[in-house]
């Protein structure tokens, strides 16, 4: 007759040291069968592994909190007043008006909304880059300092109707001027990098009360989600397997219905057709003809590029790096295709020093100024 197995559990203490776990004393519950401990090579590693997964999950999950305001600004597409790619060519019709009324997302340090968080110069018109680790919750306190209703709608993360920030019945879909709303999002496994992705991927957020107009307004930003176990630290969601990262938005801003603050060359347009073309700003991060600055890395740096595409049927872009190649979902290339709504994350090893071109490869987009430079300097 088969003996009856009696199982009981006994609390034991075990000191655990693991790079992505805080040190401390944790309680394990080893299994006893028929009054005898069954510490076999099959049971113990599996049990400890299960417990470590539980501890890791609890240790890494966090709530990331941000304070963001929407504000009216003046934006200059070419602050230098020059074509910095081909100086002898000038800015042509796209330089006859350069400064326009826009709106931007601005990040602040806390709920007083008094001290701005400084952004790298290369971010240009983009709103703050938010970050999360897989499993995190994200809380965004949004203050509308603009003169019209706005919102924040995020791609890729999980939310309910109240927090969609778009056309659902939720109160976050329509934040009136002077009002505030706190968005609650979740970066779960469906928001995190997939099997063919790098250790972090980019998602887009933007205003969605009048989405088309508000994208051209400049109300655009990104959130980067890092795979669990790949962050630099629990309080630093940046991926640990890269040295530098950049985000670039390829978008033709249609300024034909927007107020011009000042003209660039004080010249009248020759025709309505020329005016219409001149107000189409073929920009990378809101700058034209090489006026986007700050894309600099050191030789041998591991660089991640987060690419965003937005716009209409004319916004079919091909981002091209001179001098280097990138790895895109396992494919080696030096050109990445972007459609409106695209969000792509690619990796590069910066090997060759130089002041390289970075541009859209569509011919008339090159002519209209959708180009800049990125620099690789020798290792310091």
Task: Show where each model-derived region lies.
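N-terminal secretory signal peptides that target proteins for export/translocation
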Residues: 1-41
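Bacterial N-terminal signal peptides
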Residues: 45-55
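N-terminal, post-signal-peptide metal-ligating segments of extracellular/periplasmic oxidoreductases
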Residues: 60-150, 154-172, 267-303, 376-378
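Solvent-exposed, conformationally flexible loop/turn segments
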Residues: 133-135, 176-180, 243, 298-301, ...
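Extracellular/periplasmic metallocenter environments
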Residues: 141-151, 157-161, 165-233, 336-380
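Surface-exposed interaction/gating patches
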Residues: 243-322
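Active/binding-pocket-proximal capping segment
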Residues: 311-314, 318-329, 337, 364-366, ...
């Amino acid at each position: 007759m088969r003996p009856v197995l009696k199982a009981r559990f006994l609390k034991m203490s075990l000191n655990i040291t693991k790079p992505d776990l805080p040190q401390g004393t944790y309680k394990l519950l080893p299994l006893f069968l028929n009054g005898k401990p069954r510490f076999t090579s099959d049971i113990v590693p599996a049990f400890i592994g299960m417990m470590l997964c539980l501890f890791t999950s609890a240790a890494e999950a966090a709530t990331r909190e941000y304070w963001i305001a929407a504000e009216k600004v003046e934006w200059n597409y070419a602050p230098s007043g020059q074509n910095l790619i081909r100086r002898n060519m000038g800015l042509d019709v796209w330089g006859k008006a350069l400064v326009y009324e826009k709106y931007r997302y601005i990040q602040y340090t806390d709920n007083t909304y008094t001290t701005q968080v400084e952004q790298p110069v290369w971010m240009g018109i983009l709103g703050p880059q938010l970050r999360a680790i897989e499993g995190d919750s994200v809380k965004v306190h949004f203050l509308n300092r603009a003169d019209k209703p706005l919102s924040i709608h995020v791609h890729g993360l999980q939310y309910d109707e109240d927090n969609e920030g778009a056309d659902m019945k939720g109160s976050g879909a329509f934040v009136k001027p002077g009002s505030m709303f706190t968005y609650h999002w979740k970066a779960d496994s469906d928001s995190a990098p997939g099997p063919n992705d790098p250790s972090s991927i980019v998602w887009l957020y933007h205003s969605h009360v009048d989405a088309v107009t508000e994208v051209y307004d400049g109300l655009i930003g990104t959130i980067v989600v890092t795979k669990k176990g790949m962050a630099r630290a629990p309080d630093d969601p940046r991926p640990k397997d890269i040295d530098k990262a950049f985000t670039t938005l390829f978008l033709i801003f249609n300024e034909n219905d927007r107020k011009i603050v000042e003209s660039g060359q004080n010249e009248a347009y020759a025709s309505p057709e020329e005016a219409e073309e001149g107000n189409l700003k073929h920009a990378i991060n809101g700058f034209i003809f090489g006026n986007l600055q700050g894309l600099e890395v050191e030789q041998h740096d591991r660089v991640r590029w987060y690419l965003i595409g937005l716009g209409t049927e004319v916004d079919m872009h091909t981002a091209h790096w001179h001098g280097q190649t990138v790895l895109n979902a396992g494919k080696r290339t030096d050109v990445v295709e972007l459609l409106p709504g695209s969000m792509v994350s690619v990796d590069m090893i910066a090997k060759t020093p130089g002041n390289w071109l970075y541009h859209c490869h569509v011919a008339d987009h090159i002519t209209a100024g959708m180009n800049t430079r990125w620099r690789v300097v020798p290792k310091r």
